[in-house]
């Protein structure tokens, strides 16, 4: 089997979707064990090939990239124009898997995609106009043309079936896993005092305002460390000297921060899965998570849950997590081990195989 896999999101610093693509390809290459050919391809920006090579280092795939001026506009145009067929770009294939908002045209073979969430449809106020337009086109194309739709959770799977009208037998759940760097073993960060850690792009959906208010209610010398890229929309006030804004950091730095935290908090109002929850567990830190059902699978029975819109409840959950630290640490480590990228790769291969014989 020859699998063409779109990796154009790896042209940018790795966030949730980029990490999912990187892990999926690692798991797919491991599960394929040399029996299948995997071509990772991307029409990308001038700096994109270097970033993509770095993201896929050590993963057994053939890489094909093309530097393009105005690459974003050209990828959009390619998707909407319906030509040229992807076969003319990457050669013949049995499966084409596109991974984010780009949906390349193809002449034959299995057509597959991954949908991470339907936030732009359910909560347009939490997204930009550009995001709504791009993902709206992708959702419509996936529903109309894809043989396979992979999702990152049962929650997203049900949402895709109910909202987009995609047949259940076309939907396959492939839950993400923490990277190997996220382990309880290794150095822990020190920020000059005990700290609560949150990992999120600064955008309304991540609900940092409620966490900032909860942190203020806790008082004392407890710091709040915020890791994540710049986002958009209304931002919380971060001028408290007890708040440390750390920005976008490497996985190695993030693992050290997880290990050093007294509690990790993920107060998001809506997720596809919520991989930072599992990353924190894998590093042995107790976790407080929003009670929204989209986070049930990442949480399992190994977190303290709280109403994301109630800062008092979040503050109480943080205090409880500190008291129950050892129980949550053990439960979280066990739960995090149930997720592997090898399992994701096996799910992808099984889906491709089933679609090829239909």
Where are these regions (language model features)?
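Carbohydrate transferase catalytic cores enriched for Leloir-type hexosyltransferases
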Residues: 1-358
């Amino acid at each position: 089997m020859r699998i063409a896999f779109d990796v154009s999101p790896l042209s940018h610093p790795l966030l949730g979707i980029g990490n999912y693509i990187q892990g999926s390809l690692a798991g797919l290459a491991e599960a394929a064990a040399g029996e299948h050919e995997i071509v990772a391809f991307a029409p990308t920006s001038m700096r994109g090939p270097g970033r993509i090579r770095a993201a896929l280092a050590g993963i057994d795939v053939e890489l094909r990239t093309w530097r393009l001026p105005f690459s974003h506009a050209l990828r959009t145009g390619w998707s909407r124009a319906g030509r040229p067929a992807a076969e003319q770009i990457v050669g013949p294939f049995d499966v084409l898997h596109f991974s984010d908002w780009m949906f390349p045209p193809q002449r034959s073979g299995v057509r597959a995609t991954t949908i991470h969430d339907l936030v732009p449809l359910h909560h347009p106020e939490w997204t930009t106009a550009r995001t709504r337009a791009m993902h709206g086109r992708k959702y419509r194309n996936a529903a109309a043309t894809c043989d396979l739709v992979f999702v990152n959770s049962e929650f997203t799977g049900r949402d895709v079936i109910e909202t987009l009208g995609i047949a259940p037998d076309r939907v396959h759940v492939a839950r993400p896993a923490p990277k190997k760097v996220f382990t309880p073993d290794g150095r822990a960060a020190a920020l000059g005092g005990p700290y609560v850690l949150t990992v999120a792009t600064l955008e309304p959906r991540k609900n940092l305002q409620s966490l900032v208010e909860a942190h203020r209610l806790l008082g004392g010398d407890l710091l709040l460390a915020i890791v994540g890229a710049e986002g958009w929309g209304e931002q919380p006030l971060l001028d408290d000297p007890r708040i440390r804004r750390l920005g976008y950091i490497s996985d190695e730095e993030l693992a050290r921060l997880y290990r050093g935290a007294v509690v990790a908090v993920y107060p998001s109002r809506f997720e596809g899965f919520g991989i930072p929850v599992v990353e924190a567990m894998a590093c042995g830190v107790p976790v407080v998570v929003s009670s929204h059902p989209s986070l049930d699978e990442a949480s399992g029975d190994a977190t303290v849950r709280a109403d994301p819109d109630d800062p008092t409840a979040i503050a109480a959950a943080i205090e409880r997590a500190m008291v129950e630290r050892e129980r949550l640490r053990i439960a979280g480590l066990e739960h995090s081990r149930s997720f592997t990228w090898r399992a994701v790769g096996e799910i992808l291969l099984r889906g491709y195989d089933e679609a090829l014989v239909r």
